[in-house]
From Swiss-Prot:
GO terms for cellular component: extracellular space. Keywords: Cleavage on pair of basic residues, Glycoprotein, Hydrolase, Protease, Secreted, Serine protease, Signal, Zymogen. The lineage of its organism: Eukaryota, Fungi, Dikarya, Ascomycota, Saccharomycotina. It comes from Yarrowia lipolytica (strain CLIB 122 / E 150) (Yeast). GO terms for biological process: proteolysis. This is Alkaline extracellular protease.
Amino acid sequence: MKLATAFTILTAVLAAPLAAPAPAPDAAPAAVPEGPAAAAYSSILSVVAKQSKKFKHHKRDLDEKDQFIVVFDSSATVDQIASEIQKLDSLVDEDSSNGITSALDLPVYTDGSGFLGFVGKFNSTIVDKLKESSVLTVEPDTIVSLPEIPASSNAKRAIQTTPVTQWGLSRISHKKAQTGNYAYVRETVGKHPTVSYVVDSGIRTTHSEFGGRAVWGANFADTQNADLLGHGTHVAGTVGGKTYGVDANTKLVAVKVFAGRSAALSVINQGFTWALNDYISKRDTLPRGVLNFSGGGPKSASQDALWSRATQEGLLVAIAAGNDAVDACNDSPGNIGGSTSGIITVGSIDSSDKISVWSGGQGSNYGTCVDVFAPGSDIISASYQSDSGTLVYSGTSMACPHVAGLASYYLSINDEVLTPAQVEALITESNTGVLPTTNLKGSPNAVAYNGVGI
């Protein structure tokens, strides 16, 4: 089984088998099918409920080889999906260990148009039959590892300038890198509320950096609504902490998909699907949203298809490019950044505007799938160990939330609800040609910028 790396600096370690996930707080209720496709959608939900029941208390072992992710093409109709599900049901013996374990569904769409796919345990015969379909993609579940270790031990626009110790905030608010006397320059207060989903290891919501703006959304990793690793809390602090965050006004929603250093891709996809459904269900009153995922894994057509749905719904996605010092086009979902408007793949630079290089041959990924670079070396942010502590980490995991926070900031200061593509253009096209050209290796010469400081 291939291991994937998510993007702070360390080597990958496999976690123990995942415990059964806790129920997702505030999760959307089961869909009540409505509309012309109601019968087809109802039949889909019926099969999913029947097959998944046998796995209710199943603990996912990361070494299992027979788990698969199935994602339907965006062109597939609800009737076509229902037909494929019925075919699958005819192949699954009720007493066997085969079957759908969970759905990848957006139940806010009660006509079934949000049924994106499913995860299941299937033998080779069933997998071969599934692959005969022209309207779906079938792939083995893979492992995404989350290395998480400190990199070091320790009208008229109303403009606000704040002295900061965090060089990253200074960099994204100036055209050129500053040398000391760092200051974060931005518009004083966003006029419109935003929501930022952090799909990660959870958030220490009680940390003083968050001022009550961080909440638990869903937990697909274990039964503890706590960040036991620190990765998610650090990321959230960069997105929206009051001292170290880009947008200190955004609401932060924790979507936990990592309990240990590793998680199944299927679990990450479930977290993503929950976040997208939650955003859609609240979009009428809170339309300005972003999602941060500081991780990735081997190329996955099913994941790429699934995550592309976010921008169609109006949710901007920021993704870390990776720390392997290789072409970012080799990882998912970061490989879709360069070609999908509204999904931003983020590389890392250091305080001297050089593409980040770390010990052990690690460095920021690069190439045409990278959309923009942002500060990722020696970043100070919130610690998971106390309600007031800080930690210093490095990686594209740290660059990514600078961009997610910047996207939230742009959404908050504009009266018009900008599309993900419009926000991406503001971030990636406002500060170009400023990096040394020697090691770009096909990457864009662009640094994330808020358009304020000179």
